[in-house]
């Protein structure tokens, strides 16, 4: 393939497909982490392209916290059924028994128990030795220094000082028993690339990414969309309908909306061209403590 003749999106596509095929061939029991967001949708689309006309040679895994938007759950089930994917859903039973939730226990504890520990439980339960994730280097500074093949010890911990070189698209996947890797095929993509590719390939996404009138309240400088009745309003708080959309999706109490009128993909792309803020500015888990994301990744977060 002549790389010089490819557009930058086709070059990124080819690189990602190469990585996905490499992992499928090299590891005995891979899995694709499916968080239902735009990056997961692109990664799933690339995986389907990589093995077309066959089916995916690995399952999808959703680590469920019980606090995703209802539209995300509907989209997840519809997508898995439409594409004939094997979908595994894991929810930390200990966290459920303890009644862990972001309002009572805070974002750090909720994320640690329901997401990090839940993910490690699922990986151990099924014995996966490689897990695809949709993280990109432009999202956050700790992800910017992480390799495409991110090695984890037998406790799923990441050591940023112990990473392997990746020269000329050559990846060293050798691991010892009990170790595993997290693989990030979208590492070199940007948010703008993701949106342009979604438009180019007509990839289905959760409607929450498109602007619409939604019930929100402002709390701690964040526009929180009220998705169900599990919220207790604080004195002076009022729920109002506002024109908002989401740049990133997660647990609804921890994911801030942004005011926007972008109701189509071209309008989102145009909006991104002038944006000066990170898409993850609305994610509470990224700023609940100093060096938050790197600390979470060292503990086993994806």
Curated annotation (Swiss-Prot):
Name the Gene3D superfamilies for this protein.
HUPs
Tell me which UniProt keywords the record has, alphabetically.
ATP-binding, Nucleotide-binding, Nucleotidyltransferase, Transferase
Which CDD domains does the entry mention? Sulfate_adenylyltransferase_2
Q: In which pathway does it act?
A: Sulfur metabolism; hydrogen sulfide biosynthesis; sulfite from sulfate: step 1/3
Reaction(s) catalyzed by this protein?
sulfate + ATP + H(+) = adenosine 5'-phosphosulfate + diphosphate
Q: Name one GO molecular function term.
A: sulfate adenylyltransferase (ATP) activity
The positions making up the signal sequence are none
User: Per its UniProt entry, what is the enzyme's top EC class, as one word?
Assistant: transferase
Superkingdom of origin: Bacteria
EC numbers for this chain: 2.7.7.4
Query: What InterPro entries does its record include?
Result: PAPS_reduct_dom (IPR002500), Rossmann-like_a/b/a_fold (IPR014729), SO4_adenylTrfase_ssu (IPR011784), Sulfate_adenylyltrnsfr_sub2 (IPR050128)
Q: Which GO terms describe its biological process?
A: hydrogen sulfide biosynthetic process; sulfate assimilation
The answer on whether this UniProt entry bears the keyword Protease reads no
Question: Which PANTHER family does UniProt cross-reference here?
Answer: SULFATE ADENYLYLTRANSFERASE SUBUNIT 2 (PTHR43196:SF1)
Describe its assembly: Heterodimer composed of CysD, the smaller subunit, and CysN.
This molecule's function is given as:
With CysN forms the ATP sulfurylase (ATPS) that catalyzes the adenylation of sulfate producing adenosine 5'-phosphosulfate (APS) and diphosphate, the first enzymatic step in sulfur assimilation pathway. APS synthesis involves the formation of a high-energy phosphoric-sulfuric acid anhydride bond driven by GTP hydrolysis by CysN coupled to ATP hydrolysis by CysD.
> Of which family is this protein a member?
Belongs to the PAPS reductase family. CysD subfamily.
- State the name under which the record lists this protein: Sulfate adenylyltransferase subunit 2
> Per the UniProt entry, what species is this protein from, by scientific name?
Escherichia coli O6:K15:H31 (strain 536 / UPEC)
């Amino acid at each position: 393939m002549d790389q010089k003749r490819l557009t930058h999106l086709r070059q990124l596509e080819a690189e990602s497909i190469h990585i996905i095929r490499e992992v499928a061939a090299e590891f005995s029991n891979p899995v694709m982490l499916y968080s239902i967001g735009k990056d997961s949708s692109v990664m799933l689309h690339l995986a389907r392209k990589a093995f077309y006309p066959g089916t995916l040679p690995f399952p999808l895994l959703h680590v469920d916290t019980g606090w995703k938007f209802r539209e995300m759950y509907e989209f997840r089930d519809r997508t898995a059924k439409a594409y004939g994917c094997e979908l595994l859903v894991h929810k930390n039973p200990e966290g459920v028994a303890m009644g862990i939730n972001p309002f009572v226990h805070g974002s750090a504890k909720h994320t640690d128990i329901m997401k990090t520990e839940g993910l490690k439980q699922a990986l151990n339960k099924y014995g996966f030795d490689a897990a695809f994730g949709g993280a990109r280097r432009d999202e956050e500074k700790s992800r910017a220094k992480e390799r495409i093949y991110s090695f984890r010890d037998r406790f799923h911990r990441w050591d940023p000082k112990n990473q392997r070189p990746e020269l000329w698209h050559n990846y060293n996947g050798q691991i010892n028993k009990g170790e595993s890797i997290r693989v990030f095929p979208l590492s070199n993509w940007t948010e703008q690339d993701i949106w342009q590719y979604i438009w180019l390939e007509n990839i289905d996404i959760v409607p929450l990414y498109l602007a619409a009138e939604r019930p929100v309240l402002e709390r701690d400088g964040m526009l929180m969309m009220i998705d169900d009745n599990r919220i207790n309003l604080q004195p002076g708080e009022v729920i109002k309908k506002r024109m908002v959309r989401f740049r990133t999706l997660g647990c609804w109490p921890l994911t801030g909306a942004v005011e926007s009128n972008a109701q189509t993909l071209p309008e989102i792309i145009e909006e991104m061209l002038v944006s000066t803020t990170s898409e993850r500015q609305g994610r509470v888990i990224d700023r609940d403590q100093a060096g938050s994301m790197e600390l979470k990744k060292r503990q086993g977060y994806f």
